[in-house]
Amino acid sequence: MSEGRCSVAHMSSVVAPAKEANAMGPKAVELVLVKEQNGVQLTNSTLLNPPQSPTEAQDRETWSKKADFLLSVIGFAVDLANVWRFPYLCYKNGGGAFLVPYLFFMVVAGVPLFYMELALGQFNREGAAGVWKICPILRGVGYTAILISLYIGFFYNVIIAWALHYLLSSFTTELPWTHCNHSWNSPRCSDARAPNASSGPNGTSRTTPAAEYFERGVLHLHESQGIDDLGPPRWQLTSCLVLVIVLLYFSLWKGVKTSGKVVWITATMPYVVLFALLLRGITLPGAVDAIRAYLSVDFHRLCEASVWIDAAIQICFSLGVGLGVLIAFSSYNKFTNNCYRDAIITTSVNSLTSFSSGFVVFSFLGYMAQKHSVPIGDVAKDGPGLIFIIYPEALATLPLSSVWAVVFFVMLLTLGIDSAMGGMESVITGLADEFQLLHRHRELFTLLVVLATFLLSLFCVTNGGIYVFTLLDHFAAGTSILFGVLMEVIGVAWFYGVWQFSDDIKQMTGRRPSLYWRLCWKFVSPCFLLFVVVVSIATFRPPHYGAYVFPEWATALGWAIAASSMSVVPIYAAYKLCSLPGSSREKLAYAITPETEHGRVDSGGGAPVHAPPLARGVGRWRKRKSCWVPSRGPGRGGPPTPSPRLAGHTRAFPWTGAPPVPRELTPPSTCRCVPPLVCAHPAVESTGLCSVY
């Protein structure tokens, strides 16, 4: 072998244009594998798609204002769970002491994961599936996020329909859940809760008018024997669901230009209502005692594993990571947007909202506890029962009860709408970016998505719909989300590389993430997520609703729903490997190498070229260890030859239509060859350079 030439044992690669063309710009590139066996050269080739041009990236829709994006993210992250879940967990797990594990997990895992998703979407400017061009074998992680978002839409929209039903029912002089004199009430209904008693004289359990209105007047649960006896959809709830679907469609059909305007109402209204309810709640008798119980500090509870587990799980679900929503929203940002600042702002607002909503919730719970002379623990609960039974019951006892009920359910409606918009946007953006046909017909595709969620949501508005709702809530958005986020952070930090990801962020913000963020992404967050996944499986309990226990077949169906989203990751990985040419080692090398060059999308249209990631199992070769050679021109076969050192100047390769090589990519003076794997990274293709292994 000639002097100065890198030794390539038995295999070499050529990256050359598939056919000669005079037009400038990105070309389709043919990847040719040349393998020498027994003196015979065997070739295999495949056609590589060119990277997205800067012009195409510039054409992507962007938010009209920065505030549109921030309100959309805040509106999505701050949802109904902030009202019904966090205050209860805080009270249950030692009051103010619960903030210690909550804030700890927020800092070491919640904010880093939130920041990672915002940066991932903003840099790649695609939806949940498209961003995985950074590691094609893990594109299934994006489809998992899209599928989970779709599943959540099947039952989350029903909560909004319930809130709308309550809102419409509040426009009366007397709220329908005030007394027991309605057709849906049972003999067990009691207008007042007896102190320290939950049973009537004959041993039958007592129920409140608010509880019977929700379960019998709205859900008609008494007409169903279980999940195997659903009955027909209730026309009242179906009508409310139709209105919700129509509202979602017209909020989303034109993309972020319309949704960005809607969130100015849906994201800000809850704060106005929460403030009004807080002013009213703290004046009620018993409110101070309940707030004191909410904030009481019991540091001994920190020795209990359940407290830390509850905090970890709450962090995962309260921020909305793993659903593709943050990726979709940030993909419409300007390339130079400061996503780090956005992550800090939105996560802080989310946590403060969760904490402050506890004052509102417990002021009314304290009022109810004193009114019925029962301990605060007897009325404190989480889930739909808090906002559709306990809270309406408290509002019904206030002067101007109808006014306060309207205000409260307007808040629930707006909290639900912008969160549902985020979930739908994840599905629409994620699939539209993958399939251009859907992108060209976004309005029609949006209609199909919302119609699909409507049709499947009908199962949740039947007589036994609450059982379907509980099953979906238990399985569709549980372990599968945690698994998806775990695979996401492994893909970014270990396959794509935390150093390259940091370089991407530096291009956008001008600042490389500090060592703290890199350590969180690479070590702390994966360990945290693995811990939560294991705990969620180990502490699994079969779903139930009240005294009703789901049959075994329903539990099996729930696990099948969860597995259907998680299985997309290995299925797509197997498909990707099978669809690539070459040996198993070559397939794996190409499957974990980014598909396209990441470019800076700005008004200048320039796209800085990065050294390609050289696959070696997992991880990346640094560019200083690469051996750079010019590709041969069209029609020339055989292995490439090394280039002279490009010191202090740039060099263009006209036949590729590529820009000159930046000075910072000047190869080192000594050429170090790496294992014989093919490098097919478009960053090399676009400059006419190929890295020889």
UniProtKB/Swiss-Prot annotation:
Positions in the Extracellular compartment: 172-233, 285-303, 374-397, 540-550
InterPro entries hit by this protein: Na/ntran_symport, Na/ntran_symport_dopamine, SNS_sf
Pfam families noted in UniProt: SNF
Cytoplasmic side: 1-56, 497-513, 581-693
Residues the entry annotates as binding chloride: Q314, S318, S354
UniProt keywords, alphabetically: Cell membrane, Cell projection, Disulfide bond, Glycoprotein, Membrane, Metal-binding, Neurotransmitter transport, Sodium, Symport, Transmembrane, Transmembrane helix, Transport
Record-marked site positions (Contributes to high-affinity binding to cocaine): F105
Binding site for Na(+) 2: A77, D79, N82, S318, N350
Tissue distribution of the protein: Expressed in the neurons of the substantia nigra of the brain.
Primary site of residence: membrane
Membrane topology of the entry: Multi-pass membrane protein
Subcellular location field: Cell membrane; Cell projection, Neuron projection; Cell projection, Axon
Any single biological process term in GO: sodium ion transmembrane transport
Cysteine disulfide links: C180-C189
Annotated TM spans: 57-95, 96-127, 128-171, 234-253, 254-284, 304-332, 333-373, 398-439, 440-463, 464-496, 514-539, 551-580
Annotated function: Mediates sodium- and chloride-dependent transport of dopamine. Also mediates sodium- and chloride-dependent transport of norepinephrine (also known as noradrenaline). Regulator of light-dependent retinal hyaloid vessel regression, downstream of OPN5 signaling.
Quaternary structure and partners: Monomer. Homooligomer; disulfide-linked. Interacts with PRKCABP and TGFB1I1. Interacts (via N-terminus) with SYNGR3 (via N-terminus). Interacts with SLC18A2. Interacts with TOR1A (ATP-bound); TOR1A regulates SLC6A3 subcellular location. Interacts with alpha-synuclein/SNCA. Interacts with SEPTIN4.
Further information: This protein is the target of psychomotor stimulants such as amphetamines or cocaine.
Name used for this protein in its record: Sodium-dependent dopamine transporter
Species per Swiss-Prot/TrEMBL record: Bos taurus (Bovine)
Lineage start: Eukaryota, Metazoa, Chordata, Craniata, Vertebrata
